[in-house]
Amino acid sequence: MKKTIMLIAAMCMTSAITFAQEIIRVSTEKTDLVMKVSPKGRLYQVYLGDKLQNPADYENLKWDVYAASDGAVCQRGHEVYATSGAEDFFEPAVAVTHADGNMTTYLYYKSSEQKAVKGGTETVITLQDKVYPLTVKLHYVAYPKENVIKAWSEISHKEKSAITLWRYSSTMLYFKSSKYYLTNYHSDWAKEGQPETTQLSTGKKIVDTKLGTRAAMQAEPFFELGFDEPAKENEGKVMLGTIGWPGNFRFTFEVDNVGALRVIPAINPYASDYKLKAGEVFTTPEFIFAMSDNGMGEASRNLHNWARQYQVNMGMGDRLTLLNNWENTGFDFNQQSLAELMKDAKDLGVDMFLLDDGWFANKYPRKDDHAGLGDWEATKSKLPEGIPGLVRDAKKAGVKFGIWIEPEMVNPKSELFEKHPDWVILQPQRDTYYYRNQLVLDISNPKVQDYVYGIVDRIMTENPDVAYFKWDCNSVITNIYSPYHKQNQGNFYIDHVRGIYNVLTRIHNKYPNLPMMLCSGGGGRMDYEMLKYFTEFWCSDDTDPYERIYIQWSLSKFFPAKTMGSHVTNWNKNTSVKFRTDVCSSCKLSFDIDLKSLSADDYKFVQQAVKNYDSMKPMILEGDQYRLVSPYEGSHCAINYVSKDKQRAVLFAYDLHPRYKEPQQNVKLQGLDAAKMYTVKETNLMPGKQSDLECNGKQYSGDYLMKIGLNVFTAQDGTSHVLVLE
């Protein structure tokens, strides 16, 4: 008996020693996230920061950083996935009500494994409760060259009946610094990407939305963190973070009693106490983050490179320029007028004509936004030959054809609503609130998923030459009640988004090379999960070039230019067509304008600008972006793109509202080859106009251009210059 006891004790000691020595490292070329198992088997974050070069240093990292404090084991360190109802007094990563009503959970380390994935390494850590058959798997994918990490979690169980999840975070990250500065982004219709910087103090700050169909409107699903000082462009320690979830999201930033910051990205638990059945797996959204000691610019470029290579649909492919009819015609068009616009698109030089809203429904024709949504057949009175006739006309004109859809929505005045009122999110016993005169389909319902998939599949099956979809989503969820979920409404918000994923996965599997643009009341859907299925997104319905400069500056922190749709329109006609075009050319250029209203010189200009853009596209869409002069810090803005081989670059310079006799500073470029000689040539000039820039046509070394720079700003409102360096 004595020997048995000694053997058991030895085994326990061995187990404890094994746990104590267990170190898990998630690493890029510049960043380390290090976790360590405590003697009692709990998992703690012991380090997140610059990559440590000496492996022996990891042994010196302590899990019990607050060992002198009172309290239980969780309070002594930074538990990787803190639970609720047990020892931690701050915001948890996960909270569960077990099948028997118990609200406590303790997670212990079981195992970890690493495997190679495209571009990086995935680490999977398994945690388990010792009392209840509950398992949490933590996933981390590290992309070494891009210095980007994405993280998500999976929750499952084998209890006798369903458990309730009321917190379900993607991950939990800890930081220790003297000060923390959060820049989050608020928004509204036509006011996307408005930054607001706050120093975080002891306590909790929450950024969230409750919109249902989109992540963004009042708040955006991305943020910046500056450590010790507000995040800067080219210096200082920063983190950029974003969550991939086109629904209700929540960022929690909590500074505890000892000054440590925990960052918790998650689905918003609002109205979402989720019933999880035994054997099912609850998968959280991906949280993507990049850290840098050299400011936001470097972190952004890393995110851009990662996104193009590993996340965005056709991220390394080309993008189509297009002419949209919306601001030209609105709902008032017919087949003949569209055929003329297709000819205009060809003459302009763009790749495609995009037909916007108003082409569908017969019993209740789509004459305005009060009717027709849900009835996706061409209106015979407008388009007697339907989509096939439009595709034929586009071919005849020599351009591709794309089409607008809003398949997640329905008007009460539609045949679909008459046939399937049970497919609609709607409170049956209350007055109905309409958002843009429409309602949202309940895509948590598999039958509705089949219907939405069938819209795209039918169009593509009957018209395989359709080259592009603009997928809109103009309404948030109102009248919150899912006929499909009945008594289980807590699952609705989350299952609705998963239903959208199911539809998009089916579309992508069948049509993997089909470009699609996200649109949602402007820029309501800007997230990296949806971009797995879409090639680009619409930044904002605000196409005033002044406002677009600010919006595009903000969004470029997190998204590469090739994902950001920017159209030349008639908004703010007081600005020149050149200024409007130059602003849009710094992203994914397209047009939504009445070309026939342009003067002869303006028309010649936009034709040449399209050709110039085609030449510059490799730099803008694939190159490295450098934000040089912020519009938020003065009256001007400048950015440059540099090709990967540093042989070519393009500089965009904009004068917004300069002050009287304001002294002009040179713009110092970045990212060039210091030893290379670059010839500077201004492009996008009006017909017959010569460049008035002293630098035009001259040669400069990259070193000169980066240290001394070029005089490209003026004192005139709404002036722009585009310079190519090669």
Where do the model's predicted regions map?
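C-terminal beta-sandwich/jelly-roll accessory domains of carbohydrate-active enzymes
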Residues: 657-726
